[in-house]
Structure formats: structure tokens, C-alpha cells
From Swiss-Prot:
Pathway: Lipid metabolism; malonyl-CoA biosynthesis; malonyl-CoA from acetyl-CoA: step 1/1. This is Acetyl-coenzyme A carboxylase carboxyl transferase subunits beta/alpha. The gene is accD. Its main location: cytoplasm. It is found in: Cytoplasm. Residues 46-312 form the CoA carboxyltransferase N-terminal domain. It comes from Agathobacter rectalis (strain ATCC 33656 / DSM 3377 / JCM 17463 / KCTC 5835 / VPI 0990) (Eubacterium rectale). In the N-terminal section; belongs to the AccD/PCCB family.
Length: 589
């Protein structure tokens, strides 16, 4: 599978060099001071006890590890100022809304005294610090909830700061990143606290409708009214490992309905599996990950903003591949059916890994589950951000079982649609790689609305206002394949197939004899050349003797060169013309 970062960005390299130099100078100075210092009890290293493993650990070393226990990998909660320092460029943070003060809307007894004591103890005026900063040079609004302040609960001031931040970010055309760490609503402010959920959500909505990026980072714990409002409304949702994330906390569930919760319930990994989180990110990778996300969402015009360094790239096949292609015998129809089904055939992720500079996988349908049969996320095509979605059958038996042999569930189609709508919002072209025997026909899929999910994709894809390119790279099985193939252009690999259903199913339905599958394949017109004649596909991708590892570079280069030509062509069209082109493409049938 592709790695998140294939090559280091120059902004990251420069920032890390400065940080290393500063650390080296500090270490050298510490060494000189150590030579003359008298060892006293006060000089003894400060230690803390890890609440998970129970071991006594050096506080200075824990700090070096981004406040992660070096014995058991436990994530300590991080103060707002430290969190800001960990992800911001040096001296880049500019605080906003520091003048807001906490009131007592319900005249709750001793609330003002509790606030005053908490302010004195923490040095914070309220439970969130928010402002503008830079991350490797990328400007963004950054907010951090500090759990030391009344468990990071959301009262009027926290809600007001978040709402005002979204409003100002909308005015200044800035993305928003919020680190969430909260027990939920602030009980002492009652119904006024509850209203913050609606207020912050409405502000997030306006920010989104302005076409701007919002990234919440869910840390331990994120619960209650914070989870049920702004924390779960991001374009891309990140989480730290093992973070508790849920609406009703474990104690509330157990005390209210008496249900004992299983191990790992409501943790970040649980939320990823159930489709509510895009990525779980190690703390040491957070700054780089946030930068990569911000960079991918820089405002752009057109769809062919390629790096000039690649303008002279040669996408022609090697002489060896040309020779191999010339020697290859043409496949008969059934040979193509068999070839398309081979487990060793190049998969979506192989092409994605070869063609794109970087790939950042995003997960989840935001409703029920993440479907491993569909892999999707943000990639770069020679510097041009694109949304890439592929059906992945798997590379071995274990992987195939995990990915349900490339038969997507409703959750997979909904994940794909979520990513496509996200691409539309941020003006990213969409490229899909299709290789499926069909949508999963199981009972659970029917219970979760398989037909509706496919129909919804067909409906929505017809109106998405960015270019869509679809590549049929193996099996194209019925509506399950079509649900990812409503594009401005559809390309098909030389030995791929695309059909109303499998030849076996066709023979069984029409002739009541599944053994006549080979005969059925001949009459169904399922090959690339048949479908090119029928105008179902626009281009045939050569396989240079077979879609195997040896041919990957030649096939990948062919795809890449023609993808760039496609995007250059589509960049000349208005959004209305894009939609009309796609509508006419399918209207002609």
C-alpha cells in the first residue's frame, strides 16, 4: 500500500533543519553548564508516573517524545500552549479573542469562584486557545481545547471563540484546524451551553459553504456535546491513537442502561473502523500531516496545474515493451474474462502508487463503516491535486478476504461519493480505477441499502462539477462497476471486461445453463474493442503483453501521459460545459 509521504517537502526540510540546529545549540550549552554545576537534590531529573504502565519516567524525555510515554506509548494530555508549539512554526501563533470573559448565565452557585480558581491554576482565561498561525508556512486558524480548564467543557466563551474563529476564517479565506479534547457541554451553564452546539455547527456550515477547509483533530477524550457538534463536521477528521471519542461516555452508558462495554469501544480505532474518522495519526507525524492536508487544499484554478519540472517527461513505452507487445498473441474473449479475474493482475493500488507523486488515504462513509474494498484519498499528478478512488480486490488470499474480493458494500459506495463531493468542493478532478465482479450481494448489504447507494452515486456523479475520468482496469461487473464509472471519459484496459453481469449469470438467466458461460461471453460484447465500437468507452489502454509487474511502468506511463492530456482538455471547459459533456455521453444510449 502507498505511503503517506513519498518525498520530503522543501518547507518541511527547512523547518526541520532549523529545529535540529536549535536543539544542537541547546545540547551544547547544556553540556557546558553541566560541567560546572554542583549536583544537588534540586538538580535531580523531574519524573512522572505513567498512568497506563505505572512506570516512573523522565519528564524531559516524555516531552522530547511529544508527551508520549517512551515505555508503553501512552499519550499524555497536552496543554494548549504545548500543542500550539508542537504544530506551529516558531513564533507564528497570533492569539484571537483574548478579551472574552466567562459569565454565569444561570447564576449557578460558586461557579464564578470555580472559574477564578481554574484560571489561577492553569493560567488560562477559558477552555480554548484560538488564533492564526502557520504550519510549515501554510497559514491557518488553529484552536486547541485545554482539558485542564473544567475538562475542556463547552460553555458560552468556548462556543463563542469557535464560532467567531469560523466567521473570521470565512472572511479571511482561511482553513480551520481544531484540536478537540472535551468532556462535552458545561453543566453549570445549562441550556446556554447546549445552544453552543447549534451555534458552532452553523458557523462551521457557513465556512464550508464558502469552499474552505476544516480539519478537527480528535484527542483523548472527545465526548458529549463537542462530539455531537463541531468535532465531527470536518472535511477531513484526524484522531490520535487510542483517543476516547463518542457522544455518551462509557460511564454514562454503563450507568444509564447498565450495558458493559467491550474493550476498545469508542476508541479512535473503533471510530476508524466504523467510518467516522479519516486517519489515525501518530503525534510525531501530526505537524507534517496537517501541512500535507493544507498544501493539498491551496486555492487553484483549472485542473492542469502540473509541475514544470515534468513538462518534458517521456511517457512512451520502452523498446522492450514494444517488442513484447508485438509478440503477444491476441486474447480470445474467454481468455480476457480469465485474465481480468487473475489475482496477480495489476491492481488499483499498483497504478496509483506508480502514477501519483503522493497519496493520502482517507477512510469512512461517515454513517456506518469503512469499506476496505474501496481505497480513496488525495493524490498529486505531477503537482496537480486529484481525488483518486479505486476498487481493490486484494493482493493475496488474506488481503482478498479483508477486502471482500473487491465487491463493495453500500458503505464503500458512500465513502466514494463522500470523497467525490469533497473533490467538487475543493475543485479537484476525480480519477477512478474500477475492478470488481460487482457490488456485494449479501444480506447485510441489502439491509444497509445497496440499491440506494448505487443509485445515489449515479445520480450525484452526473452533477459533480469537476472532471471525472474512469478507468476500467479488470472486471467491470454490472451496476457495481457503473456506480464508479459515470465520467466525462471512460477508458478500458485491453484485456478488461465490462458487462451487465457475469457470463455465468447471463447464461443461467437466459439459457438456464451456467456452463454455457464461454458462449455467453462471445455474444455479450464485453471486451474493450466491442465497447469502443459501441461508444461505451473512449480509449483502450494497451497492456503490452499482459497487465503484470513487468508492464507496470509502460502501462502507468501511458495512463499518466493521457491523464494529463485529459485534464488539459477539461480545463478549457466551464463547469456547465463539463456537466453537459458528461450528460450527453450517457444520454446517447
Amino acid at each position: 500500500m502507498m505511503k503517506l509521504f513519498k518525498k520530503k517537502d522543501k518547507n518541511i526540510e527547512a523547518e526541520e533543519t532549523l529545529a535540529k540546529n536549535a536543539e544542537s545549540e541547546k545540547t551544547a550549552a547544556d553540556g557546558k553548564n553541566a560541567g560546572v554545576a554542583q549536583e544537588t537534590k534540586e538538580d535531580a531529573p523531574e519524573t512522572i508516573v505513567c498512568p497506563k504502565c505505572g512506570k516512573t519516567v523522565l519528564k524531559s524525555v516524555v516531552k522530547q517524545h511529544k508527551y508520549v510515554c517512551y515505555e508503553c506509548n501512552y499519550y499524555f494530555r497536552v496543554r494548549a500552549k504545548n500543542r500550539i508549539r508542537m504544530v506551529s512554526d516558531k513564533e507564528a501563533f497570533e492569539p484571537w479573542f483574548t478579551e472574552l470573559t466567562t459569565g454565569n448565565p444561570l447564576n449557578f452557585p460558586e461557579y464564578e469562584e470555580k472559574i477564578a480558581k481554574t484560571q489561577e491554576k492553569t493560567g488560562l482565561s477559558e477552555g480554548i486557545v484560538i488564533g492564526k498561525t502557520k504550519i510549515y508556512g501554510e497559514e491557518t486558524v488553529l484552536g486547541v481545547i485545554d482539558s485542564r480548564f473544567m475538562m475542556g467543557s463547552m460553555g458560552h466563551v468556548v462556543g463563542e471563540k469557535i464560532t467567531s474563529a469560523f466567521e473570521r476564517a470565512t472572511e479571511e479565506r482561511l482553513p480551520v484546524i481544531l484540536f478537540c479534547c472535551s468532556g462535552g457541554a458545561r453543566m453549570q451553564e445549562g441550556i446556554i451551553s447546549l445552544m453552543q452546539m447549534a451555534k458552532t455547527s452553523a458557523a462551521a456550515k457557513r465556512h464550508s459553504e464558502a469552499g474552505l477547509l476544516y480539519v478537527p483533530v480528535l484527542t483523548d477524550p472527545t465526548t458529549g456535546g463537542v462530539t455531537a457538534s463541531f468535532a465531527m463536521l470536518g472535511d477531513i477528521i484526524l484522531a490520535e491513537p487510542k483517543a476516547l471519542i463518542g457522544f455518551a461516555g462509557p460511564r454514562v452508558i454503563e450507568q444509564t442502561i447498565g450495558q458493559k462495554l467491550p474493550e476498545g469501544f469508542q476508541r479512535a480505532e473503533f471510530q476508524l473502523e466504523h467510518g467516522f474518522v479519516d486517519m489515525i495519526v501518530e503525534r510525531e507525524d501530526l505537524k507534517k500531516t496537517l501541512y500535507k492536508i493544507l498544501r493539498a487544499h491551496r486555492p487553484t484554478t483549472g485542473y492542469a496545474n502540473f509541475d514544470p519540472l515534468h513538462s518534458d517527461d517521456n511517457y512512451e513505452p520502452t523498446e522492450l515493451m514494444k517488442e513484447r507487445e508485438a509478440k503477444a498473441k491476441p486474447f480470445k474473449v474467454w481468455d480476457k474474462v480469465s485474465a481480468a479475474r487473475q489475482i496477480k493482475r495489476l491492481a488499483s493500488v499498483d497504478y496509483m502508487d506508480y502514477i501519483f507523486d503522493e497519496f493520502m488515504e482517507l477512510h469512512g462513509d461517515r454513517y456506518f463503516r469503512d469499506d476496505p474494498a474501496i481505497v480513496g484519498g488525495i493524490a498529486y499528478l505531477d503537482g496537480q491535486p486529484v481525488t483518486v478512488i479505486g476498487v481493490h480486490k486484494g493482493k493475496d488470499l488474506e488481503d482478498c478476504a479483508k477486502r471482500n474480493y473487491g465487491m463493495p458494500s453500500p458503505e464503500g459506495y458512500r465513502k466514494a461519493l463522500r470523497l467525490m463531493k469533497q473533490a467538487e468542493k475543493f475543485n479537484r478532478p476525480i480519477i477512478t480505477f474500477v475492478n470488481t465482479s460487482g457490488a456485494y450481494p449479501g444480506m447485510e448489504a441489502e439491509e444497509n441499502g445497496q440499491g440506494e447507494a448505487i443509485a445515489r452515486n449515479l445520480y450525484e456523479m452526473s452533477g459533480i462539477k469537476v472532471p471525472i475520468l474512469c478507468l476500467m482496469i479488470g472486471e467491470g461487473g454490472s451496476g457495481g462497476a457503473l456506480a464508479l464509472s459515470v465520467g466525462n471519459e471512460v477508458w478500458m484496459m485491453e484485456n478488461a471486461t465490462y458487462s451487465i453481469l457475469s457470463p455465468e449469470g447471463f447464461a443461467s438467466i437466459l439459457w438456464k445453463d451456467g456452463k454455457r458461460a464461454k458462449e455467453a461471453a462471445e455474444v455479450m460484447k464485453i471486451t474493450a474493442h466491442d465497447l469502443k465500437e459501441l461508444d461505451v468507452v473512449d480509449d483502450i489502454i494497451p497492456e503490452f503483453g499482459g497487465a503484470d509487474e513487468d508492464a507496470l511502468s509502460s502501462i502507468g506511463n501511458y495512463m499518466k501521459g493521457n491523464m494529463k492530456k485529459f485534464l488539459e482538455k477539461e480545463s478549457k471547459l466551464t463547469k456547465d460545459q463539463l456537466l453537459e459533456e458528461r450528460y450527453k455521453r450517457f444520454r446517447k444510449f
